[in-house]
Amino acid sequence: MGLGQPQAWLLGLPTAVVYGSLALFTTILHNVFLLYYVDTFVSVYKINKMAFWVGETVFLLWNSLNDPLFGWLSDRQFLSSQPRSGAGLSSRAVVLARVQALGWHGPLLALSFLAFWVPWAPAGLQFLLCLCLYDGFLTLVDLHHHALLADLALSAHDRTHLNFYCSLFSAAGSLSVFASYAFWNKEDFSSFRAFCVTLAVSSGLGFLGATQLLRRRVEAARKDPGCSGLVVDSGLCGEELLVGSEEADSITLGRYLRQLARHRNFLWFVSMDLVQVFHCHFNSNFFPLFLEHLLSDHISLSTGSILLGLSYVAPHLNNLYFLSLCRRWGVYAVVRGLFLLKLGLSLLMLLAGPDHLSLLCLFIASNRVFTEGTCKLLTLVVTDLVDEDLVLNHRKQAASALLFGMVALVTKPGQTFAPLLGTWLLCFYTGHDLFQQSLITPVGSAHPWPEPPAPAPAQAPTLRQGCFYLLVLVPITCALLQLFTWSQFTLHGRRLHMVKAQRQNLSQAQTLDVKMV
């Protein structure tokens, strides 16, 4: 009886809570990975420079290609608009397939995370294999998790509700960053290794438990006429066919790409999101540099470390408020407001100058928090694009994972452009080359900055001024570009309501929706 009560409590959890918990099991691993993997291989395993850059180059290519590759392999059977016959998949079966994939790939992600912290091969080979394995499983988990957001709910309100719990659990998962400081020690790596084992075991078991709960919810939808865990918009409890046999005519990759090229809102969205991804990674890459050259004389090293940790947690907490605004005003209006806020704060900081330290500190923190928060809201926009893609091309099932993968393919180059363009602009303006004088550790370091070599007195003001203009002019430029591209995006208001209505009409037997219990 003692075991029955916790089990009954778990089975009674709302679907949105179970779905959101998957973000926790990813976040507790990924934030620690981002902070420490570079420092581990450079400082602990002593990887040489050539092996490091070869690994990063291969990783860059793999990271760009695996999203559309895995999305295509997952969803290509859903693309045909032709009627199909024979044995097929119901909407429930599609969701079950995604949940089953998460049940496999989640524990494998945890296992690949462990492979970073134990030396088992030459450093260069281990670096390459670990990065590719980890990113591959992370991509599979992210694609299916995001695809479920589009498959479990259709209404904007319910998708916002699902995303609310993702942000809540992601914020909780980000606390692993703070805990990691107590264990990180490059000289004695055993305690940090044990900490990572604990995280990996917790994450793997969490994925197994959460996916089992989701699977039971979806299977109960067929047996329970009331569908207590999941509400059926139009007949999920039945077994209507969505996807037929492989003998039916399938769409080719070339035809799918041509359809995307005609999808106007998709093109405007990825143009805007490319700038957003660039800005997010620019902030991540240069956050330690800005702290060092603009604030290090006025704040302690421990304060900088706390600011770095808070910068991982605050966007998730802030996103909870943004999501409440989305329910009231819609995602389009909130995102547009955030772009205007970014532009206004940047112009204010530019006019104030680098000597207003309290305003500067607030701007550095808020710039990262609001930018990261915007990135997290854009997942909701992609789910709307999934709906529009289904309606425009009369698909038998929404190709959610594939569309998320195609968005990633177009926008991930922003990750590469951010450090390249940032270092080039700094060198162009100040003559200071970060590659020749390493003033900061990589963002993956546990410590935001080491003691830098003292620059010549004449250089210091120029470098500080260059960092300041980089800090404010990049957000201004990004905001202007994004306001233009976002103004061309029409999937909001009446058009969005029309798309939602048409999707319901086209797929009355296909759509799951979340019941808030």
Swiss-Prot record:
It comes from Homo sapiens (Human). It comes from the Eukaryota. Keywords: Cell membrane, Membrane, Transmembrane, Transmembrane helix. Highly expressed in colorectal cancer cell lines but not in the normal colonocytes. The keyword Cell membrane applies. Residues 44-55, 119-126, 180-191, 293-305, 351-358, 430-466 are cytoplasmic. It is a multi-pass membrane protein. GO terms for cellular component: plasma membrane. Residues 1-11, 75-100, 152-155, 224-264, 326-330, 394-402, 486-517 are extracellular. PANTHER family: TRANSMEMBRANE PROTEIN 180. The keyword Cell wall biogenesis/degradation does not apply. This is Transmembrane protein 180. Pfam families: MFS_2 (PF13347). Its main location: membrane. It is found in: Cell membrane.
